[in-house]
Amino acid sequence: LANDEGLIQDFNDDVDIHTKTAAEAFKIPMVEVTKAQRRVAKVINFGILYGMSTKGLSEAADMRFYEAKNFIENYFELRKKIKEYLDGLLVQAREQGYVETLFGRRRPTPDVLSSNFVVRTAAERAAQNMPIQGTEADLMKRAMIQVSRELDKRVPGAKMVVQVHDSVIVECDEDQAEEVSRVLKEQMEGVAPEIGVKLKVDVSVGKDWGEL
């Protein structure tokens, strides 16, 4: 979405994004990053994309306010493309009246022009959030369609029974589990080759949900 070439390359090279973010933000080698520092980076990698404030990061990562402020500033200094993308979403929301996912699904954004501060800031957060989470949802729906079609062809009787966030559960006979695993990995990892970012899928097999 932000077309951050460095971040895309890191994903495609299987680099631990949270560790690298921590190393860059704290200005230390990756091998010296502690679990606590990685946790802070993980909070910021996810939270800042969804409009997390300095106060929110401070509370979520158990940091002092000024530390959280410095971390966010360093993060956006390192990830200029992400800052430009998020700022651009607000401009689009105000000027065009909508934002959209990578695949073109739109959300109207009339409240970004509201004179009510609370209403306006909530709408701004939604405008920055929707294209990201919405694209994730689009990818998941596309993957489910592809998985369902392929299961019908290759594993008759297997069926999707639950979808939660970025995962799906397929119910099948025990002797079908290996082929179902292949279908899931192939179809979910290959759901959107046009985006240029490698999608990695892990598959687990169990007799019930608790074993997965």
Go through each PLM region and give its residues:
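Conserved catalytic core of nucleotide polymerization and phosphodiester-bond processing enzymes
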Residues: 1-212
